């Protein structure tokens, strides 16, 4: 699963996920992309499940890019622990997603195969997504 090799600080504040994606909002590496139209978080496990779904469908053909990285630690306190006594330990990592962000890209497959692979992958993700293709001349 994806996670940072090391961080300057183990824990991070919650923050607010606002605005729309101004970077990473167009297909840059592949021919087709999976774009999120919702705002939210994608965990490393969800990204890995979606990646496996794409890889299984396209088999040996095609090259896949994951355009987001889960670098934000989410802390949790253990079950049945009283409130207080500090912040919990980091349990998993998430990628904050704004509307318009490209999550996956693929090249080397037909449009029909890419559409079906991304449809299978989007079932693994908690956000609404749409299929996009590279603009002519890019």
From Swiss-Prot:
It comes from the Bacteria. SUPFAM superfamilies: Ribosomal protein L16p/L10e. Keywords: Ribonucleoprotein, Ribosomal protein, RNA-binding, rRNA-binding, tRNA-binding. The keyword Disulfide bond does not apply. GO terms for molecular function: rRNA binding; structural constituent of ribosome; tRNA binding. Pfam families: Ribosomal_L16 (PF00252). One of its GO terms (cellular component) is cytosolic large ribosomal subunit. GO terms for biological process: translation. InterPro entries: Ribosomal_uL16, Ribosomal_uL16_bact-type, Ribosomal_uL16_CS, Ribosomal_uL16_dom, Ribosomal_uL16_sf. The keyword Zinc does not apply. CDD domains: Ribosomal_L16_L10e. Residues 1-22 are annotated as: Disordered. Residues 1-13 have a biased composition (Basic residues). Part of the 50S ribosomal subunit. Belongs to the universal ribosomal protein uL16 family. HAMAP family: Ribosomal_uL16 (MF_01342). Binds 23S rRNA and is also seen to make contacts with the A and possibly P site tRNAs. This is Large ribosomal subunit protein uL16. It comes from Polaromonas naphthalenivorans (strain CJ2).
